[in-house]
């Protein structure tokens, strides 16, 4: 009822934020929605959910006559009217914050003017500067921001009125999270710690695979150089087909799909 204040929905990661976004867009009959996500990976994941309406159709929450929306993604800035016109034929436009930052002001204004609603997923990952630019273009429209925490990655608070808060404790009580198996790794020589962690990870993975579990191991690093160093610790396990992926890898989409297909 208040278009001057963003509606904030607080939900822990893994409790169905994306399906909730689908639900409000469908139930609200939103004409054209701009969905902002923090990363390229989440952009593709969100797009794929919207294309088939995710679990809404699978669970029978919408009727068979409900059409799937026309969905577009923004992967980089737009600098031609034709490209923008093509985007605006869609019901849902999914963009990463970094892609929107590359828009020329003229096209950014036209894009936001054409969108009737704004949804921000993982709002705590959007910097305050980006948020101010986007929010200023939606000051008289409905804005929904989903977040797992009231603080942004730059330390500033996520603004807006909280209209729904799903506490982590309640999510735990209702079975959204599985118990965590803790496997300690003790290595007192710092230079050997990565090697010790890799050994334990490989040991656990082999045990899980032998038990018939469809598991994989992911080692995440803070920089590309660090990732390359850590990858060397796994590279000799050739039967497990380890693979290195980062923002500079060629044909990254193909590598990701190969991982999903369990080729690695």
Positions of predicted regions on the chain:
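Post-DEXD/H (motif II) to motif III coupling segment of the RecA-like Helicase ATP-binding lobe
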Residues: 117, 124-180
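Conserved interdomain linker/interface between the two RecA-like ATPase lobes of SF2 helicase motors
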Residues: 162-235
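Conserved Walker A/P-loop ATP-binding site and its immediately adjacent core
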Residues: 20-23, 27-61, 130, 222-227
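Conserved helix-turn-beta segment of the N-terminal RecA-like "Helicase ATP-binding" lobe
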Residues: 41-77, 235-240
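Conserved helicase ATPase core of P-loop NTP-dependent helicases/translocases
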Residues: 240-264
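Conserved RecA-like ASCE ATPase "motif II neighborhood" in helicase/translocase motors
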Residues: 78-119, 125-133
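Pre-Walker A (Motif I) flank of P-loop NTPase domains
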Residues: 2-7, 30-31, 213-216, 264
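Walker A/P-loop
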Residues: 2-24
């Amino acid at each position: 009822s208040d278009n001057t204040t963003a509606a904030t929905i607080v939900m822990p990661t893994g409790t169905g934020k994306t399906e909730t976004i689908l639900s409000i867009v469908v139930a609200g009959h939103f004409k054209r929605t701009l969905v902002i996500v923090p990363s390229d990976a989440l952009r593709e994941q969100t797009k794929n959910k919207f294309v088939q309406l995710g679990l809404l159709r699978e669970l029978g929450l919408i009727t068979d006559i409900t059409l799937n929306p026309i969905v577009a993604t923004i992967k980089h800035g737009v600098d031609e009217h034709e490209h923008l016109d093509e985007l605006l034929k869609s019901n849902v436009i999914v963009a990463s914050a970094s892609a929107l930052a590359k828009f020329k002001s003229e096209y950014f204004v036209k894009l936001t003017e054409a969108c009737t609603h704004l949804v921000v997923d993982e709002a705590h990952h959007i910097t305050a500067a980006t948020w101010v630019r986007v929010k200023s273009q939606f000051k008289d429209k409905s804005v929904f921001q989903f977040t797992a925490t009231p603080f942004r990655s730059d330390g500033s608070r996520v603004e807006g009125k909280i209209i729904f808060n799903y506490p982590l404790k309640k999510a735990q009580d209702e079975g959204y999270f599985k118990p965590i198996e803790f496997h300690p790794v003790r290595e007192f020589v710092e230079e050997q710690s990565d090697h010790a962690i890799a050994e334990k990870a490989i040991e656990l993975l082999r045990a899980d695979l032998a038990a018939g579990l469809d598991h994989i191991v992911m080692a995440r690093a803070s920089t590309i150089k660090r990732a390359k160093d850590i990858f060397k610790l796994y590279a000799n396990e050739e039967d497990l087909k380890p693979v290195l992926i980062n923002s500079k890898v060629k044909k990254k989409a193909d590598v990701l799909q190969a991982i999903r297909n369990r080729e690695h």
